[in-house]
Amino acid sequence: MRDVLGQIDTISNAMETPGDKMGEFEQMQTILHAAPPRLLPILAIGAFSGIRVAELNRLDWSAVDLDRRIIEIRAGQAKTASRRVVPITDNLAAWLEPLERQGRVVPAKQAHRDVAALSAALGIAWPRNVLRHSFISYRIAVVKSADQVALEAGNSPAIIFKHYRELTTEDQADKWFAILPKEGQSGNTFLVDKRTGKVVMNGKRLR
């Protein structure tokens, strides 16, 4: 059977090149704090583990081990066709722990469109692969090892060193990996009228 969920990343992953990262940690915090629970896996896992869209679309919650603090990207899910293990940071664990974790992490491709609609409604730019690029840039500022980040991201050390080193400071990276859920986070709602394109968040029309 053809993988329908995987089709959404055809353009973004056909030629994965380094691009824009999220400009400020406040922007990521804003969109995470506004997101309903169903969009949090895409946002939090993308921002704090750097998993590719294609890999995320094929990921099952059984591969997310909060006790061991790892996400297993199996060979059939990875772009490079080789298994890798991605660490779960403390703040990513805080985002994932309250969620219902059964079945596919991304159950429908509509979730990606809703993330784009949410960012647009909040006035936040959403370049292609922005979460992955942001993660790699901030992660290398923390661990200071292109080899380690390459293993985690499923990329080559040469690419990491050439394109992502010194794009951000350690202080900025520390703020990125300190973004945590806010009180009442689970009550967020977000709807997009498919006919009119109007966005309603927490009962209020945004646009």
Predicted region positions:
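Short, basic (Lys/Arg/His-rich) helix/loop patches that form interaction surfaces
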Residues: 32-40, 49, 86, 94-108, ...
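Well-ordered beta-strand positions in beta-sheet-rich domains
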Residues: 70, 83-85
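Basic, Lys/Arg- and aromatic-enriched nucleic-acid-binding interface segment
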Residues: 3-53, 57, 78-79, 207
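C-terminal secondary-structure termini that scaffold catalytic or DNA-interacting sites
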Residues: 68, 90-92, 98-102, 159-162, ...
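General beta-strand recognition
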Residues: 9, 70-72
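Catalytic-site neighborhood detector that most strongly recognizes the C-terminal catalytic loop/helix
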Residues: 22, 73-80, 93, 146, ...
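Short coil/turn motifs that cap or connect alpha-helices
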Residues: 52, 60-62, 156
